[in-house]
Curated annotation (Swiss-Prot):
Organism encoding this protein: Cytophaga hutchinsonii (strain ATCC 33406 / DSM 1761 / CIP 103989 / NBRC 15051 / NCIMB 9469 / D465)
Signal peptide range: none
SUPFAM superfamilies reported in the protein's UniProt record: Class II aaRS ABD-related (SSF52954), Class II aaRS and biotin synthetases (SSF55681), TGS-like (SSF81271), ThrRS/AlaRS common domain (SSF55186)
CDD domains: TGS_ThrRS, ThrRS_anticodon, ThrRS_core
Binding residues annotated for Zn(2+), in chain numbering: 337, 388, 518
Name of the protein this chain belongs to: Threonine--tRNA ligase
Amino acid sequence: MIKITLPDGSIREYEKGITSMGIALSISEGLARNVLAAKVNGEIWDASRAITSDSTVQLLTWNDTEGKSTFWHSSAHLLAEALEALYPGTKFGIGPAIETGFYYDVDFGDRAFSQDDFENIEKKVLELAKQKNAYIRKEISKKDAVAYFTDKQDPYKLDLLEGLSDGSITFYKQGAFTDLCRGPHIPDTGFIKAVKLMSVAGAYWRGDEKSKQLTRIYGVTFPKQQELKDYLTILEEAKKRDHRKLGKELELFAFSEKVGMGLPLWLPKGALLRERLENFLKKAQVRAGYQPVVTPHIGNKQLYVTSGHFDKYGKDSFQPIFTPHEGEQFLLKPMNCPHHCEIYKTKPRSYKDLPIRFAEFGTVYRYEQSGELHGLTRVRGFTQDDAHIFCRPDQVKEEFLKVIDLVLYVFKVLGFNDYTAQISLRDPENKDKYIGEDEQWQKAEQAIIEASAEKGLSTVTELGEAAFYGPKLDFMVKDALGRKWQLGTIQVDYQLPNRFELEYTGSDNQKHRPVMLHRAPFGSLERFIAVLIEHVAGNFPLWLSPDQIAILPISEKFNDYAQDVYDRLLVKDIRGFIDNRDEKIGKKIRDTEVKKVPFMLVIGEKEVNEGKIAIRKHGGEDLGSMLVEDFIQYFESEIAKQLAV
């Protein structure tokens, strides 16, 4: 008999060789009908795979992230089977699950392919799904695997096999299709009830622009037809909220081919939005004891060699800049933390000085392939709201708790109320990916776990997702459409203080290493703004709106009074514009609604005679007429409410 520990802590005994599906059946038939795979000792397995020793087991369904991923990976295989049946001779690259479904890279040879083919392929996928063919795992020798794909004349699978060791190779078969794959997969194709092919694009084999361009087909599947309908409805709403579309309409940012791909240009309204976000966080940081610092956009290569960033991110960096006479190598700054370490070292530190909190809105640069760039969410130059806290070991937990408070304050003010904290730990089976001693990692991981529990955060733990220098706490925020985004992050780091030989004099008059905390409530400011735009559909809170008011004179003769009102509001830092176009007031109101300006101040003869303004809120609510002084008071009280959370 073997002992199986379930997520609720209960322990059950089973015969050796029990499968996860067998465990599910022992609990209830209803559960078994929904089990897609299982997490066995932290590793995702097929539900049909035998368990031969004491293990912890989590049964995975569609409601689990890993369950969805397995479902979509299996769907990619089913898509490949349909393509092979419809287009004999097709060659296949890779077909992974992604965050929003799956794709398969395909070589159709000389055959032209377009979205016009989607309907026939979808029908074939559903036809094959109804056959309820099992996904069967098989291990064979590398020699036999090479022989199989040589016979099929599939150069891409042979290329993949070249990079694998000479041990056993895993194949998966469903129906008439066999693929090279580690798995895992769902029990059978019958779980797949709805399919939608979303788009087609070109993709170079292995991401190498010198290799052949394959056809990448994106798709998504669901266990119920209604879930597909709901998903497509959300997609339509997402198109309306797309930050690239709204960014252009609201005149926030732009891109220029001459400036370079992935390098956003912030227009006046967008720059004002950024400035307000930065000032909001800067004020909160002052209250929390942070000190501002500023570092250059480039750094000597040796700085990043010392920090370990060059070895880790060198391939993602731009080429070095060489000084013409000294021959030094400089890199565009990929991270702010090495610079902050050097600031710490500018003078001796005592235990009485700690914690020291340095904060900077620092722009960093990473090389991303052109195909990976996407609006503001994936760029080559971005600004981090970076802060680094240098503290004593006994202060780590307290400082971590304070940072959690700051992150949650930011989220609450900006309306992100649905979030999960992801505790990202080191993979104990793959320690070579990380730097540092085991004892330091254990201390850091324990500090994060305890602080998260103390704050009552809803958490998930992910092995292998830690930064190379330490564990971290990432906040996974759900937006208005239910999509998850990784925004704020907090990291404990015992490694950089060692690499930079940071010291402080302790109460024992001896030298000690400080602990370093990395924190960024926004993360990338560009990415945060993109998510915020889509979350609020461009309807920013009053305090954050680039244009907070629009003054709409009914005719030209009221322009002087409109200017007077504008000047009085500007003194109070109330920003906006005067629409003095020769247009009817109805058109001015409609145009202002499209611009999502929170307040419209309409001025006609009555308002001029009474020294007032007629106030209309975005969305159509009429607040009547007010004296300018009364409006200022009302405006300021509205902002105070939004910031007092």
